[in-house]
Amino acid sequence: DVREPDEFAAYRIEGAKLIPMRTIPARLHEIDRKTDVVMICRSGARSHHAGQFLKQNGFERVYNLAGGVIAWAQDVERAAA
């Protein structure tokens, strides 16, 4: 999750790890290159850019949650209805 701490505190997806976008370069060592990495943000824009950065730095299994947590929450609400 590349959102800011206040955004993450307000709404989070279970199992997500908070690494704010601005801190990714210094925290690359915390991300496992051998597993799938799903990038998450509010709308999908920041996570897209962060995912591109990871790919440029040798990560191969990088995916973006299209539409971000906004779209994810809407999908969950529709499924629950």
Kindly give the residue locations of the regions a language model identified:
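Rhodanese-like catalytic fold shared by cysteine-dependent sulfurtransferases
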Residues: 5-38, 45-81
